[in-house]
């Protein structure tokens, strides 16, 4: 049986915190910032926590053995 590997795309975009939650960067922050309000841009700077239902799926991709 070959070794199970974590999904590389998921590994680049998500990280697991010490408490076990899945953290990710907000989207829509790459370019075309002039259309977006300053309030929205400030909110998008912060990283977000994935919902509990989605984090279970993501943990299986990041840590296939765990």
Swiss-Prot record:
Lineage of the species this protein comes from: Bacteria, Pseudomonadati, Spirochaetota, Spirochaetia, Spirochaetales
Keyword Disulfide bond: no
GO molecular function, one term: structural constituent of ribosome
Stretches of the chain forming a coiled coil according to its record: none
NCBIfam families: rpmI_bact
GO process annotations (BP): translation
Family: Belongs to the bacterial ribosomal protein bL35 family.
Source species of the chain: Treponema denticola (strain ATCC 35405 / DSM 14222 / CIP 103919 / JCM 8153 / KCTC 15104)
GO annotation, cellular component aspect: cytosolic large ribosomal subunit
Annotated protein name in UniProt: Large ribosomal subunit protein bL35
Pfam families attached to this UniProt entry: Ribosomal_L35p
């Amino acid at each position: 049986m070959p070794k199970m590997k974590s999904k590389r795309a998921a590994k680049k975009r998500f990280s697991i915190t010490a408490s076990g939650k899945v953290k990710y960067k907000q989207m829509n922050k790459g370019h075309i910032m002039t259309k977006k309000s300053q309030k929205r841009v400030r909110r998008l700077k912060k990283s977000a926590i994935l919902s509990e239902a989605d984090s279970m799926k993501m943990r299986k991709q990041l840590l296939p053995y765990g």
